[in-house]
């Protein structure tokens, strides 16, 4: 029996210890700092790359051997920080700490603030900063003055209690709730969202195949496809790129168009929780007709120049003696023909006909592909809502919660009060109330 009682007391002690720990502000701050540190690590170290990438970039022979090498990165999960069990556990414990703090501290404090407290003895006012004796004749006049300053008034005999700014005491609870909501939305996106990248030629259909990241509970929809109807680039007068556009249609399983939109950078297409972004582009081929015969599609390969400009090169004739190369630098309709020695022999316009090496060659058109990023994050609406509530509740939390007490004894009136912020403004308010009541 004694042993059972000891076990019960031990369990009770453990519960109280955990309650005090989780509701402790310092504990929450430590958790927040740990989350910030690991988030910084996740920002510095590239996430969700192939193992070969880390073996190349973070070799065992570098100067940070004891800390930052590919083995440690993969061992501790720094290559996918935000989906590791320990990071998600930190978020859960931090949320639990905020919830416990709200339940055990904030809500009781709010309930206590809503109770009416009346003082009967003027000596009780000595603990208040700015307490004073007021020269007036009626208690009702003081109550009226408090109402002019938006105080909620309660009277009991010869005592008055007033308060205002109760929302300022309520706001911290909503701040904690907003942070918990924010973390919930973030975790939901991590475990059930996904990201895909596709490079699609103009006129082609595509489905979600190249998934670059996904959560454990992600669902990759395959009940519809998409088609790139057209791709074009808008250039500045100096031939630099101003913007590139993709005309995209969403199709159901029967090929019926469900939605069509032209996307560009910062203007994505949204459909059933999916967001399709314009991210990149490429030139993959040029179509030519030789001697009015068959149409050939010449593949192009991109080459990065030392000045970071990109060109596309394709082989027009394979024979060594008559080998020619076609070079494009953009999609503005011009190209250049080079011989096997790398000499520029002809500048052409796409869509026109030329005689080259005794052959009539018509350069019909170029085929470009658009780089698309497709994302699904079901936590985004929750995150946006939580930010709205967080900003609103933080703003409201700056409202001062002020309490004022007035007592009459032997025809003398005493006033005093407390506030949780803006102490000087509160003392000035007390003086104004005193002057107003004395002048009536």
UniProtKB/Swiss-Prot annotation:
Domain of life from the UniProt record: Eukaryota
Its membrane topology: Multi-pass membrane protein
TM helices/strands, residue ranges: 25-45, 84-104, 170-190
Stored PANTHER family: CYTOCHROME C BIOGENESIS PROTEIN CCS1, CHLOROPLASTIC
Species the sequence originates in: Pyropia yezoensis (Susabi-nori)
Keywords for the protein's UniProt record, in alphabetical order: Chloroplast, Cytochrome c-type biogenesis, Membrane, Plastid, Thylakoid, Transmembrane, Transmembrane helix
Biological process, per Gene Ontology: cytochrome complex assembly
UniProt entry tagged with the keyword Transmembrane: yes
Compartments in which it is found: Plastid, Chloroplast thylakoid membrane
A Pfam short name: ResB
Identification of the protein by name: Cytochrome c biogenesis protein Ccs1
The family this protein is said to belong to: Belongs to the Ccs1/CcsB family.
Subunit structure: May interact with CcsA.
CC annotations in GO: chloroplast thylakoid membrane
Function of the protein: Required during biogenesis of c-type cytochromes (cytochrome c6 and cytochrome f) at the step of heme attachment.
